[in-house]
Amino acid sequence: MPWLQVRLAISPEQAETYEDAFLEVGAVSVTFMDAEDQPIFEPELNTTPLWSHTHLLALFEDGTDAAAVLAHMELLTGGPLPEHHSEVIEDQDWERSWMDNFQPMRFGQRLWIVPSWHAAPEPDAVNLLLDPGLAFGTGTHPTTALCLEWLDGQDLTDSHVLDFGCGSGILAIAALLLGAKEAVGTDIDVQALEASRDNAGRNNIPEGKFPLYLPEQLPQVQADVLVANILAGPLVSLAPQLSSLVKPGGRLALSGILAEQGEDVAAAYAKDFELDPIANRDGWVRISGRRR
């Protein structure tokens, strides 16, 4: 079934006004997207993270009169609309399109991330089967890739690993497949824990080797290896707690950090860790080191 799509170029300050107006005139969905391929920076507390130049996309059922929608929008918002464009688009199998675009990826020397519906390119390699849905990590983001490559380069034999902010479980499961004895996962999102559990089962990881906790339930572990791919703000504020969870001589890898935030995050861990040079990819960085 075809749809009418209306696109507006807006600022973050206009987002709520135009979203409400589009829903008022009958839009079946309203979506915000980046107009300039910018990353979303960490927002202030209690604010909605949006790009400085944002496109708002409103979708209407087939047969909707675009001119009438735009005229009604001007009445509701009290003036001329920002730069806009309307077109009729054909329906697609969005899930199938996404699946077709998610292909096997290699990280380091040994590790492959392979969609569960795809044959492994190297059956004898370390193949992590992943079916994350659309919400959690797949390995395509530079921060996840930096962490996976770091794990691939470590000797994880019989180690105890903590994945803080585990999401899909991709880092913890990779560590287990690379030789870790146990990986503990924690996340504030119950759905993330469920995704981790599902992906562990898909990779034949026994439940006892990958216990999962909400942060307030996390026991006081002493990890050989801690990975945390979250955001710079939490990494800085949680530095004392995360440092205490790594045993002396243990290793740490942190990401989810923009390049300009790297020095501040590194400074929060420099007292307790002998830090490696910061690794940078596409404007994102990884900080790693060994516990003093």
From Swiss-Prot:
Xref: InterPro entries: Ribosomal_L11_MeTrfase_PrmA, Ribosomal_PrmA_MeTrfase, SAM-dependent_MTases_sf
Signal peptide annotation: none
One GO cellular component term: cytosol
Entry's localization field: Cytoplasm
Pfam annotation, one family: PrmA
One of the GO BP terms on file: methylation
Known catalytic reactions: L-lysyl-[protein] + 3 S-adenosyl-L-methionine = N(6),N(6),N(6)-trimethyl-L-lysyl-[protein] + 3 S-adenosyl-L-homocysteine + 3 H(+)
Entry's Gene Ontology molecular function annotations: protein-lysine N-methyltransferase activity
Enzyme class of the recorded protein, top EC level: transferase
Chain sites annotated for binding S-adenosyl-L-methionine: T144, G165, D187, N229
EC number: 2.1.1.-
Entry keyword set: Cytoplasm, Methyltransferase, S-adenosyl-L-methionine, Transferase
Role this protein plays: Methylates ribosomal protein L11.
HAMAP family reported in the protein's UniProt record: Methyltr_PrmA (MF_00735)
Alphabetical list of NCBIfam families matching this protein: prmA
Annotated family: Belongs to the methyltransferase superfamily. PrmA family.
Protein name: Ribosomal protein L11 methyltransferase
Lineage: Bacteria, Pseudomonadati, Pseudomonadota, Gammaproteobacteria, Pseudomonadales
